[in-house]
């Protein structure tokens, strides 16, 4: 099969990203296990509050695998399958837009989850059990910054997926060479 060079570059970039995010997911799982041990259930931290404190960090493991590894692998497979079925290749500029939106957006989303998870776990370890006050202190208490950073991360990730999905959908109806 003749794979366009811009597809090869995308495959290489997205596969490397998936490998890195698999490692991040594994390390996030290990760090969660070790960090949760340091914030045990106690009189100051009953079971329900313990779950509320460690859950943000627990979710990083699965999200890193899903949005950082499995989804990029599925998208690379989808693009390759489209080529093998004779769909019109997606343009280099479109793939570049999808890459530069999705990969940083998903990496930032996972990084934000790590930050939030450790914000909660470390807060509990140092005796902060007033969760409303601790949540208000997130991002130094700057709610506008918090909303902006989360908004940028999720918008970039979603826009990257949308660009790729629309381009793939348009290419499905046309055979290569049309």
Regions found by a protein language model. Give the residues of each.
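Hydrophobic alpha-helical transmembrane segments of multi-pass integral membrane proteins
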Residues: 1-178
């Amino acid at each position: 099969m003749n794979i366009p060079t811009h597809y090869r570059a995308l495959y290489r970039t997205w596969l490397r990203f998936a490998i890195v995010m698999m490692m991040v997911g594994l390390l996030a799982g290990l760090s969660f296990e070790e960090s949760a041990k340091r914030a045990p259930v106690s009189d100051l931290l009953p079971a329900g509050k313990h779950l509320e404190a460690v859950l943000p960090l627990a979710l990083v493991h699965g999200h890193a695998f899903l949005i950082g590894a499995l989804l990029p692998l599925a998208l690379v497979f989808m693009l390759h399958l489209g080529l093998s079925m004779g769909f019109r290749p997606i343009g280099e500029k479109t793939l570049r837009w999808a890459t530069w939106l999705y990969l940083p957006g998903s990496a930032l989303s996972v990084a934000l989850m790590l930050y939030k998870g450790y914000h909660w776990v470390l807060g509990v370890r140092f005796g902060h059990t007033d969760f409303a006050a601790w949540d208000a202190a997130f991002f130094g208490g700057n709610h506008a910054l918090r909303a902006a950073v989360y908004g940028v991360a999720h918008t970039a990730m979603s826009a990257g997926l949308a660009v790729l999905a629309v381009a793939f959908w348009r290419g499905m109806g046309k055979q290569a060479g049309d």
